[in-house]
Amino acid sequence: MVEFTVAGVPCLGLNGGPAFKHSEAFSFQIATDDQHETDRYWNAIVGNGGQESACGWCKDKWGVNWQITPRVLTEAMAAGGDEAKRAFDAMMGMKKIDVAAIKAARRG
């Protein structure tokens, strides 16, 4: 067992051995307030041996998956209807989430 902290949240991990690989079935999600914060987390993960993926997902150098999710995207999806569809469609073309583009999509 190993205890660690992620973004101020205490976590507990267990080494399951080589039979248990990291996958997208598990990820950490960090909710961000703006583009600066989104960029800071994204660049810290991807810029240190990580890998970009689609729709705000990335993988760190140890193969752990992360979702860097601006709150504006979560709010747009929760709004439902056309606003959610426009935000979803915009997100589908992104790797790192572009906050300004999501805001523009919300407005239509």
Describe the function of each predicted region.
Residues 2-53, 59-108:
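Glyoxalase I/VOC metalloenzyme domain signal
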